Amino acid sequence: MRVTTGIRVRRQFGEDVLRILRARGLVDNSLLIKRREDFLIIPLAQEVAREELRELGVEADLVAEDFEEASRRPNFFENLRSILSAEDLKIIPRSYDIVGDICILQLPKELYDRRRVIGEAFLKSMKNIRIVLNKTEPLSGEYRVGGYEVLAGEGGTETFYREHGCIFKLDISKVFFTPRLSAERIRVASLVKPGEVVCDLFAGIGPFSIIIAKKNPSVRVYACDINPYAYQYLIENIRLNKVEERVKAYLGDAKELSGRDLKDVGDRIIMNLPMSSEIYLDAARNALKRNGGLVHLHVFLEKDVDSNEKYMNIEESFRRLGCETKLLSSRRIREVAPFKYHWGFDIEVKPRKY
C-alpha cells in the first residue's frame, strides 16, 4: 500500500476523466484505482492544482488516499529507456490522443529516424491500443483533416470512440475529431434547455450534436458539415445512438444552409471552427431565430492576444451585421501548439435596437 494524492470523481464520469488524465500522463499506473460507493479514486502520477484540473475540464476533489500496488506491464517510457538516449527521452511528448483503439502521437523531427521503435514501444505498453499513428501534418483545408503515418500495429484508421454514453464511428484520416473537447461537449450539453433548437454549423461526425440530443430528449438539433466523409459518419452515428428523431444531418456549406434550410430556426448555435469561425458570423446570425439566441463561438488565440480584446472584435463584427451582443462567459479550452490556445466564447446575440 502507498499513500499519495488521488482524484475522487463520480463513477459515471470516470471513463471520460481517465481518458483526459491518461492522455496527459497524469495517472499513476503503478497503483490500482479505488472504487468506493458511487466514486472512483484515481491515483495521480504528480501533484496537480485544482485550477489545472479545471482547465482540463475536470471537476473533482483532490484527496490523500492509501492505494494498492498494481502488477503491470512496463509503461511507454520504461520500454524506451533501453532504446533511446537520455536526451531523446527528454523530448518525447508526454501527451497523446487516444481515439478508440488508435493512439496518436506527434513526435518532433529530431526523433524521426526512431519513430518506428517509439511506436512499437507504445503499442507494447497499452493493451487496448491496436495501432499507433504519428501526426505528420497539421489540420488544414476545408475539411480540417491532418496527415498521419502508421508507426506500429495494423488494421486501418477507422475506429469506434465512446464518450459521455455515446458511441462514434470515424476514420481519423478522413475527418476532423479530437477527444480533447470532451469536457467542452458535455458542458455545452448541460446548458441546453428543454425544447430548444440547436444548430451545429460545423458538426463533423456529430459529437456535440449527438451528446446534446442524448442528454436532452426534447431538443431538436440540426447538424451540418461540408466534408462528405464526415457527413456519412454523422448519419451513421445518429443511427448508432438512436437519435434519428432528434438530430437531422445536412451536407453543405454553413453559409448556404443558414440562408436556406436553417434560416431563423435556432435558439443556440455551435461554431466549433476555431481556425476561421469569425468569417461565419453571418451564418450564425441567419440561423438564429429572429429574436436572437446564444452562440458558442470557438477561436484560436496566440498567447499574447487578450481574450477581452478578441471579444470586442467579435462584438464589432456582430454589430456590423445588425446585432448586439452580451458576453456570458469565456474560457481557455486547450493548448493546440506552443503559445497558441483554443478559446470558447458563450455569447448572447440579439437584433440591434435602432
Role assignments for model-derived ranges:
Residues 1-354:
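SAM-dependent transferase fold signal centered on methyltransferase-like domains
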